[in-house]
Amino acid sequence: MKQLVLASGNAGKLEELRAMLAGLPLRVVAQGELGVEDVPETGLTFVENALIKARHASAVTGLPALADDSGLIVDALDGAPGLYSARYAGSPTNALANNAKLLDAMREVPSDRRSARFYAVIVLLRHPEDPQPLIAEGSWEGVITTQPRGDGGFGYNPVFLDPVYGLTAAEMDTALKNRLSHRAVALATLQHKLHAMSL
């Protein structure tokens, strides 16, 4: 079985990606298991950051690497927190502080203007200098709640409501969330290529 390194130090993201990749004929290994440390995300776009992470993990391990960069885009905040979603309330990353800052920024925003989306870019590099990385993107439309709901998931999940289901991402069971999420959409685009690829 071939190995694929997941270029992330985010435990919640790793768990989600591993579950979504479970059916593939790959041994999925987190970068931390191979001694790879996080690399600074200095890109100006989600794609650039995902490429930076994948190249770093692949260069250190010599393995193909899968990296994701994602964020929450809130229309009433002109796209914030966006690229800086993980560090919205400052460093180090703190989901509770990020959610509190977001809800505070949205305090006066009426219900009909609370639209938002989770957005993800997933990059697969076969080797560090791969001239044709596979890039897929996905989004998940929703609205920002007025208070946190649910205790599942991670990050902004307690404040992101899927209006079709009437549940926040934190209230959904794993199977439903992994079917609807921005990462699931991006991975679905990538999966048929992974099945056919010679890693």
UniProtKB/Swiss-Prot annotation:
A GO biological-process term: purine nucleoside triphosphate catabolic process
One Pfam family named in its UniProt record: Ham1p_like
Residues reported in the UniProt entry to bind Mg(2+): 69
Catalytic activity, EC: 3.6.1.66
Record has Signal as a keyword: no
CDD domains to which the protein is assigned, alphabetical: HAM1
Family annotation (InterPro entries): dITP/XTP_pyrophosphatase, ITPase-like_fam, RdgB/HAM1
Keyword terms, alphabetized: Hydrolase, Magnesium, Metal-binding, Nucleotide metabolism, Nucleotide-binding
Residues holding substrate: 8-13, 70, 154-157, 177, 182-183
GO molecular function, a single term: nucleotide binding
Keyword NAD: no
Entry's Gene Ontology cellular component terms: cytosol
Reported cofactor(s): Mg(2+)
Catalytic activity field: XTP + H2O = XMP + diphosphate + H(+); dITP + H2O = dIMP + diphosphate + H(+); ITP + H2O = IMP + diphosphate + H(+)
Cofactor details (free text): Binds 1 Mg(2+) ion per subunit.
List of catalytic residues: 69
Family the entry assigns: Belongs to the HAM1 NTPase family.
Protein purpose: Pyrophosphatase that catalyzes the hydrolysis of nucleoside triphosphates to their monophosphate derivatives, with a high preference for the non-canonical purine nucleotides XTP (xanthosine triphosphate), dITP (deoxyinosine triphosphate) and ITP. Seems to function as a house-cleaning enzyme that removes non-canonical purine nucleotides from the nucleotide pool, thus preventing their incorporation into DNA/RNA and avoiding chromosomal lesions.
Alphabetized PANTHER family for the sequence: INOSINE TRIPHOSPHATE PYROPHOSPHATASE, INOSINE TRIPHOSPHATE PYROPHOSPHATASE/HAM1 PROTEIN
HAMAP family registered for this protein in UniProt: Non_canon_purine_NTPase (MF_01405)
Subunit structure: Homodimer.
Protein's name according to its UniProt entry: dITP/XTP pyrophosphatase
